[in-house]
Each structure stands twice: as structure tokens, then as C-alpha cells.
Amino acid sequence: MNYLTSQLLINEEIETINNNLKNQSDLWEDGKKTAGSYASKVKNNLQINRNSELSKKLAELIKNKLLANPLIKSFALPKLIHGIMFTKSQKNMGYGRHVDNPFMSSGRSDLSFTISLTPKDLYEGGELIIETINSENKFKLNAGEIIIYPSTYLHSVEKILSGERIVCVGWIESYVKSIEKREYLFDLDAGAKGLLAKHGRSDELDLIFKSYSNLLRLLGN
């Protein structure tokens, strides 16, 4: 399965975001407003109005954190980060099985991401389920942790049994659309950087970095 989990936000950032969301409780609205015609039938959560100044400010914070993270940049090769929103699921809320729209008003969805803003021991249920051809994978993230996965996968969020789950979600349009090609580039980049850290610069390593850059030019769009 082609996905990445990583700690993205520090405690101070999580606290700042949550305090802002709590202070603007009037901005929460029905999550169905931004779902596609099919997904709206299985979506049951709340979200902050994306046109609000608060949403725009917090979305910019998240976008900057993603673009400043070398691991995420290497994995996702982000061309555009878009559609960032903040959602809340309370008791008996969830999001049924669906696939994300391939094209949104804000861009193409190659990769989807979820960032947890709630400690996982403060709510029951609410696991993110991502389906592949032969497996079903459940994730319950630590506060500040992100998961990035292909938007082509069917996925769902289980009903909340108690407490509430607040997350940030969004999409990435990648310079490389293909899952397989992104994986090859990620492996090559990680291997080259590992060799550089272990052995230092060399003429041979220069050729590997050259090949990576030229492959990205060839495969990217």
C-alpha cells in the first residue's frame, strides 16, 4: 500500500488550531455542502466554512507546514495543495465508503491527506479505513500526525461511539500522477540521500542525483 504517516504538527500548533476552532463555533456547518453528489449520501460530519477568514488562515498554516516538510515533499511531489478544510465528527457521525472526486474546483486530486487534531484516546470509533484490492487498513492517528494516501482508494470513517474527532483534510495535485512512478522516484531520492548522509558526496552520487532530476523532468507534468 502506497501511503505515508508522519508527525506534522507540534503541540503548540495543535493547541493554536484547536483554540481558534473552539472560539469560532458559529462557523461549523453541514459537511454535505462540499461533498459530491454520491459522497453526500454517506457523509455525516461538520466542517468549518471554507470561505471564512479563519479557515483561510488555518489552511495557509497547514499548507506551509506541508511544503516545509522534506519527507512529504519527496513522497508527494506536490504541485498544488488544495481543498483544505477542518471537519468535526461527534457521536454517531462518520463518513461512509466513497472515493474522492478526481477533479475539484481547486485542482486534481492525486493524493488525499488527513491530519488529526484530537488525541486518539479522547474518542472511540472514528477510524479511517482505506481499502486496497486485497486488504482493508484501519488508521487512528495521534494528534498532529498526518496520513497521505492515493485519492484513487475507496475509504471511509467509522462512526464515532463517544467523544469527538476533529481533523484537517485536503488534497494534493502531484507533479507525477502515477502512483508507481511516484514510488520509484521516492525510493531513488531516499536512497541517494541516505548514501549522501552515510558516505558524503561522490562523483557516482552526482550521477544518481542527476538521474533523479532528469527522471522527474521526464515523468512530471
Curated annotation (Swiss-Prot):
Residues that, per the record, bind 2-oxoglutarate: 165
Keywords: Dioxygenase, Iron, Metal-binding, Oxidoreductase, Vitamin C
Residue ranges of domain Fe2OG dioxygenase in the record: 80-174
GO molecular function, a single term: 2-oxoglutarate-dependent dioxygenase activity
Residues bound to Fe cation: 98, 100, 155
EC number, as in UniProt: 1.14.11.-
GO terms under biological process: DNA damage response; intracellular iron ion homeostasis
Top-level taxon in the UniProt lineage: Bacteria
PANTHER family for the chain: PKHD-TYPE HYDROXYLASE YBIX (PTHR41536:SF1)
NCBIfam families on file: PRK05467.1-3 (NF003974)
Name of the featured protein: PKHD-type hydroxylase A9601_13531
